[in-house]
Amino acid sequence: SKILMPGLRMGLMVVPTELVERTVVSKHNSDISTSPLIQKSLYYYMSKFNWDKHSSDMEKIYTDKFLETYKYINKKLGGRLTIVKNKGGINFFLGLNRGFSSRNFVNFMYNKKVALQPGYIYYDLDIEDRFFRINISMETMDRIKEAIDIISDSLDEFYALSRIEAKGL
């Protein structure tokens, strides 16, 4: 979908807070199957246009974006967060210090206008809830860098608030 029709979305969901996690998992599961609309669009595109050129152009765009983001993440967050080696895709998994929750961090960052996803929804096994995901497919490089800057500027505040909450103050 990122190569053929990046950003194709149909509809809007307003979900009660208590259902957000289940909804994200559900949406992720539905996204991994290919709808007839996408299949027909791909057939049309391949038969009417130069698919090879389009595919090559998209690969270059996303590779350049990925590499620039990778460098920026390492510059701003390297040594402060665990950066998981990417094994494909155009997203990044980062880990908070041990003992801190990505679910809490995702909510904390959402209030700062940065949308992240908790990493646990991408794993089959229970793991430490400290990893989160950054997806770069739809954002501009300026917005990606802005979001990384906000994450960098907010880490110490998040850690401090989490410690206070853990002490029950």
Give names to the regions the model predicted:
Residues 100-105, 142-146:
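Short, conserved charged micro-motifs
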Residues 16-17, 47, 95-97, 137-139:
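Residue-level recognition of strand-loop junctions within catalytic nucleotide-signaling folds
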Residues 1-60:
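Conserved core segment of the aminotransferase class I/II
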Residues 43, 56-70, 82-95, 105-108:
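Conserved glycine-rich beta-strand-loop-beta hairpin in the small C-terminal domain of fold type I
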Residues 111-112, 125-169:
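PLP-dependent enzyme catalytic core of the Aspartate aminotransferase-like
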